[in-house]
């Protein structure tokens, strides 16, 4: 999964959720799918955290110049 892309992992996670919500899996199949889903969710979360750390915002100062600041999301 180390070389997997975020978009690929997210699509796999969405498919796992659809399969689990479908209700046609056995208990063993459901547990296996759930474990795989947790791995994909963790991978996606880590990728999003990495992306957030890399995002910077350009802020305009009073004197007209710009400064780069870390992105601070509204929570």
Curated annotation (Swiss-Prot):
Q: According to its UniProt record, where is this protein located?
A: Cytoplasm
- The UniProt entry lists the main location of this chain as cytoplasm
EC number(s) recorded for this UniProt protein: 3.1.11.6
Q: Which reaction does it catalyse?
A: Exonucleolytic cleavage in either 5'- to 3'- or 3'- to 5'-direction to yield nucleoside 5'-phosphates
The broad enzyme category this protein falls into is hydrolase
Q: Which Pfam families match?
A: Exonuc_VII_S
Q: Can the keyword Cytoplasm be found in this entry's annotation?
A: yes
Q: Which InterPro entries match?
A: Exonuc_VII_S, Exonuc_VII_ssu_sf
Q: Which cysteines does the record link by disulfide bonds?
A: none
Give GO cellular component annotations, separated by semicolons.
cytosol; exodeoxyribonuclease VII complex
Keywords per UniProt: Cytoplasm, Exonuclease, Hydrolase, Nuclease
Role, per record:
Bidirectionally degrades single-stranded DNA into large acid-insoluble oligonucleotides, which are then degraded further into small acid-soluble oligonucleotides.
How it assembles, according to the record, is: Heterooligomer composed of large and small subunits.
| Family, as annotated | Belongs to the XseB family.
- Write the protein's name: Exodeoxyribonuclease 7 small subunit
Taxonomy-wise, where does this protein's organism fall, top ranks first?
A: Bacteria, Pseudomonadati, Thermodesulfobacteriota, Desulfuromonadia, Desulfuromonadales
